[in-house]
């Protein structure tokens, strides 16, 4: 099951705000950007934005990757602190990988960023 609407970042301005902080962590499969939510955002939970470029492949391949990332994120969402906006950028290597590898690599990059343990790195 995918990420529900209140848990998604949809506005371009929200994506740009997270990218502007220049807090990024990466591995071979993903680049993760994170930022605390601004006061205007009236949610008390994390939000996720996914970016899957045309370098990944055709539309059906990009949707496949988005679904796998979303499912993996939902499986580990209990470990994500509230009031955090996270943007995940998929790299081309993620295409065609098994769900287990995608989830493990997503956990790895979120751990590098200090997001999983609730101590976000600067």
UniProtKB/Swiss-Prot annotation:
Belongs to the RnpA family. It is an enzyme of class 3 (hydrolase). The lineage of its organism: Bacteria, Bacillati, Bacillota, Bacilli, Lactobacillales. Consists of a catalytic RNA component (M1 or rnpB) and a protein subunit. The keyword RNA-binding applies. This is Ribonuclease P protein component. It catalyses: Endonucleolytic cleavage of RNA, removing 5'-extranucleotides from tRNA precursor. HAMAP family: RNase_P.
